[in-house]
């Protein structure tokens, strides 16, 4: 009534936006976002170590999460921590919808203007084999050598697979993909018990003694681990503390120093 136009149409089955309602919707969303930001800012000013922290993580980042999560929970017992493991594309979409506070993943192949990425570490795309596999003792492996192996691969859409596909599509080689899976720790388990070879980031094998990572001999073979936040969004006190703990933890420091 205050606006002088009808924003919603109701019938016995549903409520839908009118044309003025569609036009007004972006402003309404911005108002809600601004109100939520103000609430977070006031809470942080009062140093209230309470609330919820929503973190999006891709599967490859699992090795660096455990120590940070346990330390954070001990230090901030009143903050509820929600960790979401998904594909990078899905997590970045969640970030844009403000459903997560930040995302930990590798840098996407194509930058998104609404998202700010800060580097954590660098690693390489690698062939993952059992420790007693014939390739395990090599310092590097070529695509031609991989084409001669039975492969157990991460599914299309996962970052390591996307990175590999970019190089594979430029070659004239055929790769014998015997198995695809979107659960990285199960891939590592299968590879460690067989002669299958997988392709993942070298950092993925951290903490898995039954497998080794052999860098793939490729131009510009570098994967950049990043913290992704929404451009211009307010960063919670809890998020700053979590990321500070993450940067200080030993597993991440080993990754940084290994490159």
Where in the sequence are the language-model features?
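A late-sequence structural motif
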Residues: 64, 213-256
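A short LG(V/I)-centered, amphipathic sequence patch enriched
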Residues: 1-19
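Secondary-structure junction motif
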Residues: 106, 136, 149-171, 235-243, ...
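Beta-alpha-beta core module
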Residues: 112-118, 122-124, 138, 185-234
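Short beta-strand-centered segments that line the small-molecule binding cleft or hinge
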Residues: 26, 67-71, 89-125, 129, ...
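Hydrophobic hinge/microswitch elements
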Residues: 87-100, 106, 159-214
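N-terminal winged-helix
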Residues: 40, 46-76, 80-84, 89-92, ...
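Flexible hinge/capping segments at coil-to-helix
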Residues: 46, 114-151
């Amino acid at each position: 009534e205050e606006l002088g136009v009808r924003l919603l149409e109701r019938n016995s089955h549903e409520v839908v936006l009118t044309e003025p309602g569609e036009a007004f919707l972006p402003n309404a969303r911005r108002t809600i976002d601004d109100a939520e930001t103000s609430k977070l800012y006031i809470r942080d000013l009062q140093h209230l170590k309470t609330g919820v922290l929503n973190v999006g993580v891709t599967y490859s980042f699992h090795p660096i999460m455990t120590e940070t999560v346990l330390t954070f929970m001990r230090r901030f017992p009143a903050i509820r921590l929600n960790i979401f493991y998904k594909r990078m594309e899905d997590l970045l979409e969640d970030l844009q919808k403000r459903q997560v506070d930040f995302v930990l993943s590798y840098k996407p192949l194509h930058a998104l203007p609404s998202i700010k990425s800060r580097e954590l570490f660098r690693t390489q795309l690698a062939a993952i084999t059992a420790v007693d596999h014939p390739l395990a003792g090599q310092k590097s492996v070529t695509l031609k050598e991989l084409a001669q192996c039975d492969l157990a691969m991460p599914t299309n859409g996962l970052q390591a697979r996307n990175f590999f596909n970019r190089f594979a599509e430029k070659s004239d080689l055929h790769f014998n993909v015997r198995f695809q899976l979107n659960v990285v720790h199960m891939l590592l388990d299968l590879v460690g018990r067989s002669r299958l070879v997988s392709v993942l980031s070298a950092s993925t094998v951290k903490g898995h003694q039954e497998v080794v990572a052999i860098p793939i001999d490729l131009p510009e073979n570098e994967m950049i681990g990043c913290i992704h936040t929404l451009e211009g969004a307010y960063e919670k006190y809890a998020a700053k503390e979590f990321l500070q703990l993450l940067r200080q933890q030993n597993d991440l420091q080993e990754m940084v120093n290994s490159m």
